[in-house]
Structures are given as C-alpha cells and as structure tokens.
C-alpha cells in the first residue's frame, strides 16, 4: 500500500463540468482507438484543477468509467505521482523548492514566510482553508533560485520580504504576477551584460 493515502474526508460524487469534459474529450481524441487509457494522467490533472487542486476517490472512479479502465489502475497512477494531491490543499497550493541551489540562495527564508503567513506545519490548510504549503524537491528553475510554485506558476528570484508580499496577495484572494522578482527576463544575467556581444565593450 502506498504511503500517500487519500484523505479520510471524501465527497460522495464527482463528474466533469462542461469545461473539463470538453478538455477531456479533446485529449482522448489524440490517442488511437483502444488506447484511450493512455490519457489517464491528463484526465487526473483536469480533475485536480476542477476540484480545488486535489483528487478525491470519486474522481478516480469517475475517470475509470470514463476511460473504461479498472478503478484500481487509476488509483495506482494517482497515488504514485506526487503531482497529484490526495487531500485538500486549498485554492492556492504553494510549493517551496528547498533543494541545494535554492537552499544556498535562501530558501529557508521562503519557508519561514510560509510558516508565518499560511500555517506552522506543511500540508496544513490556512485558517481560511484557502491555502497550504509544502517543501518540494527541485522544480527545475535553479538559475532563478530561490523560487516557489503556486498552482501552475513559478515565482522566482525571491527573498523573504517578496515572499510575504506574494502570500499576502493570495491570502486576500488575488493572483500575484508570476516570474522573476528581481526584474529579470526569464533567466537572463542580472548585470548589464546580457549576451556575448555585450563583452565587446567590456
């Protein structure tokens, strides 16, 4: 049995809304006839997006029927991949990278900010039940360390002050601007020299 277990509190029913249903059908069309079960990961993601960032057992059963796939097979996929949340995380799910590059650049300060603003413990919902946070392994944006991910967006080049400001926005129901918080474009250098051509006048 997986160590990642579903929440004890589960809704009785789940079904795709019209937007999710349209997206699911579009994805299934990409697969050859008889291979629709290959869309299971994409459909789990759609279900998670619809259901405030987590997947209840009812959604797994629904997807199983939708794909003519045994429920246990859907359950195996959902519990194996950590990108699928098996319990409520709130409308804003904050993932703080604490792998070496981010830690060396001050990720511990981002963790402090999350503890102060959201909850003292990881994976614990904020007082308004709208937000939670957790430490994660590398999110692949090492050059913009330290950084964190909120739902689908990256927030990069952070410090504690900027992190607190971002968290204030989401706790008030807003959506902060993603990207670099030091004014960089993607992962360009921070100084005046942006390309090798700039070295001519160095």
Predicted regions and their residues:
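Signature of N-terminal electron-transfer/Fe-S-associated modules in redox systems
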Residues: 1-202
């Amino acid at each position: 049995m997986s160590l990642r277990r579903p929440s004890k509190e589960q809704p009785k029913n789940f079904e795709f809304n019209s937007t999710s249903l349209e997206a699911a059908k579009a994805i299934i069309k990409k697969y050859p006839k008889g291979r629709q079960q290959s869309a299971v990961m994409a459909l789990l993601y759609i279900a998670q997006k619809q259901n405030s960032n987590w997947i209840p057992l009812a959604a797994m059963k629904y997807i199983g029927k939708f794909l003519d796939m045994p429920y246990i097979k859907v359950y195996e996929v959902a519990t194996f991949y950590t990108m699928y949340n098996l319990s409520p995380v709130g409308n804003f799910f904050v993932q703080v990278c604490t792998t070496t590059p981010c830690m060396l650049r001050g990720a511990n300060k981002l963790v402090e900010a999350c503890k102060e603003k959201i909850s003292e413990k990881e994976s614990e919902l904020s007082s308004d039940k709208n937000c939670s946070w957790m430490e994660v392994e590398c999110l692949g944006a090492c050059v913009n360390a330290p950084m964190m991910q909120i739902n689908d967006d990256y927030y990069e080049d952070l410090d504690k002050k900027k992190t607190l400001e971002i968290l204030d926005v989401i706790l008030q129901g807003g959506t902060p601007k993603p990207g670099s918080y030091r004014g960089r474009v993607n992962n360009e250098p921070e100084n005046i020299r942006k390309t090798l051509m700039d070295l001519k006048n160095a």
